[in-house]
């Protein structure tokens, strides 16, 4: 009795669905987008790094580097202050031919500057650790972007006060809109340089 009820409900289910012909299957199969079955659709779509995502990551990398530079500069100043504050200095004696307070201040400033210069090393490691999955694609896009910059930048030998070079290394480019504006600026620079020759 139970199996006959299952058969009856399955017959009703299949009877309510329209019959599918081979021609209908062929026509729908050609219009459906294909993807590999090795990854789900959400993983495949998110693994491709677009140019806008690249510029966002590039801006984030720059911010991380500046932040780490400020952090390491403060760290360098604090470490040098901790060392120099424990030294016994005779205020009547000169150090390197200068007043001791001047030498201590210069040492603190120099260690802060050294810390600031070492900051991007720390920042790049933080960026690599935080974006490990996209790092290979980011590096490939960065190489491709730098090739575009090298191919499209202008000759800086004909610059003047009235015709400055537009961002020779492309460091200020942070979006596709800014890249297009940079291309327009390069074209205007080249046109103006030809007119004045």
UniProtKB/Swiss-Prot annotation:
Segments passing through the bilayer: 64-84, 103-123
Annotated transit peptide: 1-14
Indicate yes or no for the key word Nuclease.
no
Predominant location category: mitochondrion
One Gene Ontology term from the biological process aspect of the record: intracellular protein transport
- Protein family membership: Belongs to the PAM17 family.
Name it: Presequence translocated-associated motor subunit PAM17, mitochondrial
């Amino acid at each position: 009795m139970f199996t006959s009820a299952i058969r009856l409900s399955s017959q009703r289910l299949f009877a309510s669905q329209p019959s599918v012909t081979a021609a209908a299957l062929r026509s729908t199969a050609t219009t459906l987008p294909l993807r590999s079955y090795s990854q789900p659709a959400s993983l495949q779509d998110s693994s491709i790094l677009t140019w806008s995502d690249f510029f966002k990551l590039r801006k984030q990398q720059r911010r991380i580097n500046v932040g780490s530079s400020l952090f390491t500069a403060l760290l360098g100043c604090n470490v040098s202050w901790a060392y120099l504050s424990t030294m016994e200095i005779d205020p009547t004696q000169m150090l390197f031919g200068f007043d001791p307070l001047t030498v201590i201040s210069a040492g603190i400033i120099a260690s802060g500057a050294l810390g600031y210069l070492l900051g991007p090393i720390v920042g790049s490691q933080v960026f690599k650790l935080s974006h490990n999955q996209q790092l290979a694609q980011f590096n490939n896009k960065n190489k491709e972007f730098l090739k575009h910059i090298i191919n499209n930048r202008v000759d800086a030998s004909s610059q003047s006060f009235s015709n400055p070079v537009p961002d020779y290394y492309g460091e200020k480019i942070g979006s596709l809109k800014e890249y297009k504006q940079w291309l327009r600026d390069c074209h205007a620079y080249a046109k103006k340089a030809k007119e004045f020759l």
